[in-house]
Curated annotation (Swiss-Prot):
<feature type="transmembrane region" description="Helical">
    <location>
        <begin position="55"/>
        <end position="75"/>
    </location>
</feature>
<comment type="similarity">
    <text>Belongs to the methyl-accepting chemotaxis (MCP) protein family.</text>
</comment>
<dbReference type="InterPro" id="IPR003660">
    <property type="entry name" value="HAMP_dom"/>
</dbReference>
<dbReference type="InterPro" id="IPR004090">
    <property type="entry name" value="Chemotax_Me-accpt_rcpt"/>
</dbReference>
<keyword id="KW-0488">Methylation</keyword>
<dbReference type="GO" id="GO:0006935">
    <property type="term" value="P:chemotaxis"/>
</dbReference>
<comment type="subunit">
    <text>Interacts with CheA, CheY and CheW1.</text>
</comment>
<comment type="function">
    <text>Mediates bacteriorhodopsin- and halorhodopsin-dependent photoresponses by detecting membrane potential changes. Probably transduces the signal to the histidine kinase CheA.</text>
</comment>
<dbReference type="GO" id="GO:0007165">
    <property type="term" value="P:signal transduction"/>
</dbReference>
<feature type="domain" description="HAMP 1">
    <location>
        <begin position="78"/>
        <end position="132"/>
    </location>
</feature>
<feature type="modified residue" description="Glutamate methyl ester (Glu)">
    <location>
        <position position="416"/>
    </location>
</feature>
<keyword id="KW-0807">Transducer</keyword>
<feature type="region of interest" description="Disordered">
    <location>
        <begin position="557"/>
        <end position="627"/>
    </location>
</feature>
<feature type="domain" description="Methyl-accepting transducer">
    <location>
        <begin position="266"/>
        <end position="502"/>
    </location>
</feature>
<keyword id="KW-0472">Membrane</keyword>
<keyword id="KW-0145">Chemotaxis</keyword>
<keyword id="KW-1133">Transmembrane helix</keyword>
Amino acid sequence: MNITQAYKRSLWWSMDMVGATGSVERKMLTAVGLQFLAAGGMAFLTVFTAGTVQLIGVGGMLALSVVAFYNTYLIAEADFVEPLVALEDAADDIAAGEFERADIPSSKRDDEIASLVASFDGMQSNLEVASRQADALARQAFDDPALDESVPGAFGESITEMADSLEAYTAELEDKTAELEHQQAELERQSEQLRALVDALSEATDAARAGDLTATVDAAALDVTDDHRAAVEDFNQLLETLADTISDIQSFSDAVLAVSRTTDERVDAVADRSAAVSESVTEIADGANQQTNQLNNIAAEMDTVSATVEEIAASANDVAKTAQAAADRGEDGRGEVEETIEALRALREQSQAVAETVESLAAEVERIDGITALIEDIAEETNMLALNASIEAARTGSDGDGFAVVADEVKDLAEETREQAADISEIVDAVTEKAEDASIAIGEVDAEVERKITKAEGVLRDFEAIVDEVANVNHAVQEISDATDQGAQSVTDVVGMVEEVASVSEETAAESDTVADNAAEQTDATDEVADQMDELAEQTAALAGMLDDFTVPADAGTADQSVADDSPTAQPPAADDEPAAAVVDQPQPASDAEDEEGVPDSGGESVAVSDGGWADDRSSFTWADSQ
């Protein structure tokens, strides 16, 4: 044990003796009290002692101050710095998630710092337990002993609830897993059933493709569901329907063969009759064409006459339009002349009004001139009075100075008034001269306006005469235009009638040609129909040979056949279980090509069946389910 540790022990023993270790506050007060006591002692010695005693006392107080400072340092380091630094390190470890590495220092004291350390240690323990529980939940180790440990507060309750929820969820997942395994086994069983069903359907389909329509699928021998059993029954029903249809087609092909032979004979008779009709219609068409040519010539001549009349009518219309335009222009010119006369008359009235205004102005100027003369007379008399007043003022001497001044002012005013009156007189003379000039000019304007009015009235009379003459010309031209229009309309009506007759003749010729062509085409068509009926007979025989390759049940196609003798289309009655209707399209022109089996090309002939249709195209059968 060194001196420092011994001193620390003695220091804390002494603080225990005085009861200062139980509180940080008392520790600090004790250290500060010692320093204050040393400072107070030094002050006391400085005031009340002197000499050697003072020096010894001050030295002792200084040593006491050093001891008090050192004690304060030891207390702060041991009770404050070291515990707080340790708590900081532990908090850093906890913040980093290292709960087990957090080392909380123990404290043997019972002050506030010791209480803080104890609380922090409890928090670290709870966090460590929570960490172990979270790890156990993550590993789904619900029997881990850590889950039995309790964590106080709401956080511990949350951990417990989370553990219970996870355990329940895990149990539910186990149940779902077992259910999925059961469903997987069921799916595997159904897959085996479907595989067996597909194999059976494949064998039956191969047999049907080979022509054996008696090969069906035994649904009772297969372990399948009701839906799959219904599909098997539909497939078997489909084969039965196909067998019935093929049997009906076999019967139908025999009927078609008989009908084709009868039709061939009738077609030959129709061909002979069509040839005779074609010759007669050709003769009618030739006569209609000749008549049409003659009518077309007449119509051409009438078109020429109509064009000439229309040109005359157009020329007359142009002349009428020109005359009407001239009349309109004459009317417009007369209106403009009348407007000009009215404007000149208004100008004359305005100039007369201006002349009257100028004369009134001259009269007023003369009045101003009289007033100006009166002002000059008054100014002259005022000047004379001022002169007399000056003479009287001079005669009275010094007593008349004031009167003399007034006389001078009056004299000056009279002089100024006379000068202004002279200026006004000059202005009045100038205004009078201008007014006289304006009056002369206005008189000249009135004379000129009067001449213009007289001339415009003469022009107006000329315009009225022109308008009357143009109106007469326009009326005459209009009568000519109306007459030519009527003539043109008459010619047009005649041309229309001729053209209508020619059109009827052309239509008759065209229809005759059409009838002749149709008769020829009918003859060709009957020949072609005869050829096609022969080909149909050959194809029907080939179809019967191909149908013989199919194996059908003995009771298939038991329905009777009904064939019309005069129609190439036959509809055999349907079977009892599935209604079926066969329609044979009109045969197309046959080709000379044959397929590999030596069967003539059908040329596009097809036989359609409404339920489960099949088609014969170039001697090959293709199954097409018509749904």
